[in-house]
Design a protein with these regions (language model features):
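Blade-loop segments of beta-propeller domains
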Residues: 90-116, 120-123
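Repeated scaffold domains used in trafficking and secretory/extracellular systems
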Residues: 59-60, 95-101, 144-151, 194-200, ...
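Short loop/turn segments immediately following the C-termini of beta-strands
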Residues: 76, 112-114, 163-165, 214, ...
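Short, solvent-exposed loop/turn segments at conserved positions within beta-propeller repeat blades
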Residues: 116-122, 165-172, 252-256
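Beta-strand-rich domains and repeat architectures in extracellular enzymes and scaffolds
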Residues: 53-80, 99
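Asp-box/BNR beta-propeller loop motif
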Residues: 77-94, 122-139, 173-188, 218-230, ...
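Residue-level detector of Asp-centered blade-edge/turn motifs that repeat once per structural unit
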Residues: 65-67, 102-104, 151-155, 203-205, ...
Length: 334
């Protein structure tokens, strides 16, 4: 069995024609690297702080502000923000953010600078302490662009999957830092099967990390050195609930699926999804201020909010088009 973090190839595709067709669809939407973590995209936005028509086309993450008031979607042309039922452009540079992830008080990202910014391309690892208005370089600029990047909400632990060696990582694979990139450690990744498609870090324990592949969802409790299979089947998105007990996993097995898994006990609950046609969940996020509120974004560029723990979902974007809506009771059910 190939180790996905040691340069091995992914496992065989499913015999199901439905799954093969779906992966062909995903591959058409994926970025040039072939990772499924990027949604092909364009953002058409008004001026910062003003209501605007928004068309979503590369969505490279999904995260709330620390106060829970704003939902951010990063892309090739800066950050789009959903606040009080309205879409707008978030203040800050129009960088091409990749691997965007949030902690309690910070944003972390990789990607490419906006044209004319004069910054080195690619970013390596960058950090924002002010909601994306300004960014600090944390190293590896001009060397690495991390499409798979995840952070620990309360710890600021950063895990990345790099495709090639760089000045701080002697080999490709899974690496992590606990001090904002001053020192990186290599994770062995034993037990992983298949090509990585998603990455998640426990909110409080930096040693607990999950990796999704086409062959399953894999969990490590020793900082990525060894993994055990937590769930079978392709995993397109992974996200640790802020309660630290549950892990969200999205896939497609004849239909789009979303599960909330007790990663210690192993029990799983299927979460009902809104109607999705030839689509699946690509990102999951939880509001840190109102923890029954979740957001999902899909590969076909739709986005939904739930304020009841995933029982019902209200659309805030449909197939790339932002939907401005009045705040209040949710209007759509699965």
């Amino acid at each position: 069995m190939a180790n996905a973090f040691g340069g091995g190839t992914g496992g065989p595709e499913s015999d199901s024609s439905t799954i093969r067709s779906f992966f062909m669809f995903l591959e058409r939407l994926s970025s040039a690297t072939g990772l499924l973590g990027g949604l092909v995209a364009l953002l058409v936005l008004g001026s910062a702080g003003a209501a605007a028509d928004v068309t979503l086309t590369h969505v490279h993450g999904l995260a709330w502000s620390a106060d829970g008031a704003r939902l951010f979607i990063p892309s090739h042309h800066g950050l789009a923000v959903y606040e009080n039922g309205k879409w707008s452009k978030a203040p800050g540079p129009a960088h091409d953010y990749m691997g965007f992830s949030a902690t309690r008080a910070r944003f972390y990202s990789s990607g490419h600078p906006a044209p004319g910014s004069g910054l080195v391309n690619p970013f390596g690892l960058i950090r924002s302490d002010d909601g994306g208005r300004t960014w600090k370089k944390l190293g590896l600029e001009g060397e690495s662009d991390f499409h798979l990047l995840a952070t620990g909400f309360a710890t600021d632990a950063v895990y990345v999957f790099n495709h090639a060696p760089n000045s701080r990582m002697q080999s490709a694979g899974l690496h992590y830092t606990l001090n904002d990139g001053l020192m990186w450690k290599k994770a062995t990744g034993r037990g992983i099967e298949g090509e990585p498609t998603s990455l998640a870090v426990h909110p409080e324990d930096p040693k607990v990390v999950a990796v999704g592949t086409r062959d399953g969802l894999f969990l490590s409790t020793d900082a990525g050195d060894t993994f055990r299979r937590l769930a079978a089947g392709q995993t397109l998105a992974a996200f640790f609930d802020l309660d630290g007990t549950h892990l969200w996993s999205a896939g497609h097995e004849g239909k789009p699926t979303l599960h909330r898994i007790d990663w210690k006990g192993g029990s799983a609950r299927e979460v009902a999804l809104p109607p999705l046609t030839e689509d699946a969940v690509a990102y999951v996020a939880q509001n840190p201020a109102r923890r029954d509120e979740y957001a999902i974004a899909t590969f076909k560029r739709s986005a939904f909010l739930s304020r009841d723990g995933g029982k019902t979902w209200a659309p805030i974007a449909r197939q790339g088009q932002g939907v401005d809506r009045r705040e209040g009771p949710q209007a759509s059910k699965p």
